[in-house]
Amino acid sequence: APAESNPGNYHGVSKFDLTGIPDPEVAPAESFSNAFGRTLSAAGNTDKTLCAITAAMKYGTGLQFFSHAHPERFFDVGMAEQHAVTFAAGLASKGMLPVVCIYSTFLQRSYDQIIHDVNLLHENVVFAVDRAGFVPGDGETHQGIYDPAFLSQTGMPIYSPSNYEELRHWLPILLSHEMQGPRAIRYPRGGESKALAKYGCSGKEYDKLI
């Protein structure tokens, strides 16, 4: 069956042919998740300490690129967000640079671990917060509206790129070993706003949109 042979793509589906006849392949539109995933995978080519952790959200967070390129440094712990964060803290304590990629609404499950296992110990863990902000199409359970509150912790910067250019600029900086301690980057589901793509910043200049 198509869903059994390709469970990732059938995790969440729109309308499709019930007979299983595949539609003509169409190149998927770019998204924040895929822009993140490609940038992270490219960084993994040169930094062998870089690893990615998710909780049953490989395709949703764009980690299929990293998992294919660096399978030995990709970890899917299943639906266990608390364990994902504690596992990341352990890897960081041994010199690795773990990137925890979880939807905003599910990352709140690991609030205690973020504080006690990562931040209080000042471990080098990067949190990639997908589905941040209002999330269309996924229903009430997937709204990412609380992470600005529970990630606002002492010594933990939060980056929120408004377009792909900003994401590609800031992510390598967050992955630099010159940064110390936990840090987070949050981005919405789907694609960038055309207005923000036009007026977004390069990291050196900031524009105010009204």
Kindly give the residue locations of the regions a language model identified.
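Membrane-interfacial segments at transmembrane helix termini in multi-pass membrane proteins
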Residues: Y187-E192, K198
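Thiamine diphosphate
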Residues: A1-P182, G191-S193, G203-E205
